[in-house]
Amino acid sequence: MKFTFIKSLLIAFAVSLFSSFQLMATDMHGVMCGGEIRPADQAVVDQFMSDNPGVNVTMEAVPWGTCQDKVINLAIAGDPVSFSYVGSRTLKGLAENGHIVAVDIPDSQKKMYQPGILDTVSYKGNIWGYPHAFSTKALFMNCGLIEQAGLACEGPQSWDELYSMAESVKNNTGAAGIGLTGKDFDNTMHQFLNYLYSNGGQVIDPATNAITLDSPNTVETLEFYAKLANVSQEGPLAWERSQLTELFNDEQIAMYINGPWGAGQHKEEL
């Protein structure tokens, strides 16, 4: 089968309140996945504390690799955070186990979201978080390496074309054709979903909430992901997503998938 150029539109993040009793607490603890407290987030917290004298809010920045596990484990242990900036994919499980409270978004605010966005944080008739970020994934290409392999630097329009391009680079240059990750679940899942969504696959049927990972789309994607290991850097099981950017900058891989932030992390000549 042939598929269009790899590009996935993903709802990446959501914010939820953990534990209703903590809303009345004088001390509130929030976890922000991503490793940093952004000025805009701090400004909101500062304004909240100003509007609510006697309430103290502390925020903790945790890298994505460990953040969601930490939030979930705290909730399971009975010591949930008051709020957290996490991936929307975690909300269904947290809601099922009673670890988060539903949110009430006014109709006037619902109209601000694009169609389908709120579905990513909805489950059994309730909304469990505020969608915050919407990320597009793209295939970044090193034209120098691709042209060195004797090819035109044009985006592949199918998986067959992608593999053929990566294979030509690996066979005709000193670089790998494409960057692949598999060091741990978080890294592997994110990269795999990029390919799954581009193949028309999904994890959960939005209409029935049925798990659809046993679909033909998933099987095809698994087979292709495994095949890519033949043209990737050596030992993809040892690599994290963030390290692919370094490999790309060092011209050790000709292509890899990343979000739009990747463009600002590349060397100017690339």
Name each model feature, range by range:
Residues 88-138, 160-163, 188-191:
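Hinge/lid segment of periplasmic solute-binding proteins
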Residues 21-93, 107-111, 237, 262:
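Conserved N-terminal structural module of periplasmic/extracytoplasmic solute-binding proteins
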Residues 165-168, 207-237, 267:
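Glycine-centered hinge/linker elements that transmit conformational signals in sensory
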Residues 61-70, 89, 157-163, 236-250:
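Short helix-initiation/N-cap motifs at beta->coil->alpha
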Residues 128-132, 137, 161-210, 217, ...:
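Extracytoplasmic/periplasmic solute-binding protein
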Residues 75-86, 174-176, 250-258:
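Alpha-to-beta junction loops
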